[in-house]
Amino acid sequence: MQILLANPRGFCAGVDRAISIVERALELFGTPIYVRHEVVHNRYVVNGLRERGAIFIEQIEDVPDGAILIFSAHGVSQAVRNEAKSRDLTVFDATCPLVTKVHMEVARASKKGIEAILIGHAGHPEVEGTMGQYSNADGGMYLVESPEDVWQLQVKDESNLCFMTQTTLSVDDTYAVIDALRERFPQIVGPRKDDICYATTNRQEAVRHLSDKADVVFVVGSKNSSNSNRLAELAQRAGKAAYLIDSAEDIQESWVEGASHVGVTAGASAPDILVQQVIQRLKALGGKVAVEMQGREENIVFEVPKELRVEVKQVD
């Protein structure tokens, strides 16, 4: 049984930055550090930070005065940001810069009174944060998930519309929704550059290549990770058995029976240690040496806030 590794896979620049912000805050300021929502959607990462003293909360009111608060990589609404500002809190923003780009698009539309349509998944924290950048009562902010939603949508002024997207969507599904938007609202304006982030696009492209070779595909990622779910869906659409797993312990021997090639990838919030554990589990089930597939090289890095870049002095 050959083990094939998708390339690229795992951590993206935004996730790396968000985790580093929490780690640096813990190093510089000690415990506790409060984080609004899971900093990234991965159980292993969140549990590790929790063990080190991070406290994950959903409501700003749960943070005591004078505490340090970090916003998750998914971003927050303007209302949440304003609530934090009104409190005696030190705030560090771990919002992915590519999510912030979409926030700015929405804020500009709100300021100009342009109605805005967001393509995204209802209830996802990134969507809630992005929708929460719009405040102009004379305009309008709408959420659509499918072409069907587009055809049912009613807006105030079809000649004054723009759209943007969640960063972690299926590329193919999103283009289908965009096509519907352009057909329904011919004058609608889209972003100058695609809102779906480079890491989402690259990992989806990599899992397509992986699915061409593999009989079974394992996606390392948590159930609440949007981009990880999209990877599993892509492999399934390619006709392959695909499993979204949190860890190597989830793998059942029956899943790989009769498979000659087993593929492994990881969502953008899944650390490489989990992939290595999956490889070891597959080797125990008869897998050979893992082979890296060719793919796009990624060299994007997002800096942490300057306040967190200072060196921690070691005390003898």
Swiss-Prot record:
What does the entry list as the binding residues for isopentenyl diphosphate?
H41, H74, H124, S225, S226, N227, S269
Provide the residue positions that the database annotates as binding (2E)-4-hydroxy-3-methylbut-2-enyl diphosphate: H41, H74, H124, T167, S225, S226, N227, S269
Q: Any idea of its EC number?
A: 1.17.7.4
Note whether Transmembrane helix occurs among the keywords: no
| Top-level lineage group | Bacteria
Q: Name the positions where dimethylallyl diphosphate binds.
A: H41, H74, H124, S225, S226, N227, S269
Question: Which GO-annotated molecular functions does the record name?
Answer: 4 iron, 4 sulfur cluster binding; 4-hydroxy-3-methylbut-2-enyl diphosphate reductase activity; metal ion binding
Where is [4Fe-4S] cluster bound in this sequence? C12, C96, C197
Q: Which reaction does it catalyse?
A: isopentenyl diphosphate + 2 oxidized [2Fe-2S]-[ferredoxin] + H2O = (2E)-4-hydroxy-3-methylbut-2-enyl diphosphate + 2 reduced [2Fe-2S]-[ferredoxin] + 2 H(+); dimethylallyl diphosphate + 2 oxidized [2Fe-2S]-[ferredoxin] + H2O = (2E)-4-hydroxy-3-methylbut-2-enyl diphosphate + 2 reduced [2Fe-2S]-[ferredoxin] + 2 H(+)
**Which cofactors, by name?**
[4Fe-4S] cluster
Cofactor binding mode and count: Binds 1 [4Fe-4S] cluster per subunit.
Q: Name one GO biological process term.
A: isopentenyl diphosphate biosynthetic process, methylerythritol 4-phosphate pathway
**Pathway in which this enzyme or protein is active:** Isoprenoid biosynthesis; dimethylallyl diphosphate biosynthesis; dimethylallyl diphosphate from (2E)-4-hydroxy-3-methylbutenyl diphosphate: step 1/1; Isoprenoid biosynthesis; isopentenyl diphosphate biosynthesis via DXP pathway; isopentenyl diphosphate from 1-deoxy-D-xylulose 5-phosphate: step 6/6
* Keywords linked to the UniProt accession: 4Fe-4S, Iron, Iron-sulfur, Isoprene biosynthesis, Metal-binding, Oxidoreductase
- The active site annotation covers E126 (proton donor)
Give the family per the record. Belongs to the IspH family.
Q: How does it assemble?
A: Homodimer.
What does this protein do, in the record's words? Answer: Catalyzes the conversion of 1-hydroxy-2-methyl-2-(E)-butenyl 4-diphosphate (HMBPP) into a mixture of isopentenyl diphosphate (IPP) and dimethylallyl diphosphate (DMAPP). Acts in the terminal step of the DOXP/MEP pathway for isoprenoid precursor biosynthesis.
Spell out the NCBIfam families in the cross-references.
ispH_lytB, PRK01045.1-2, PRK01045.1-4
From the Swiss-Prot or TrEMBL record, give the protein name: 4-hydroxy-3-methylbut-2-enyl diphosphate reductase
> Which taxonomic lineage is given here?
Bacteria, Pseudomonadati, Pseudomonadota, Gammaproteobacteria, Enterobacterales
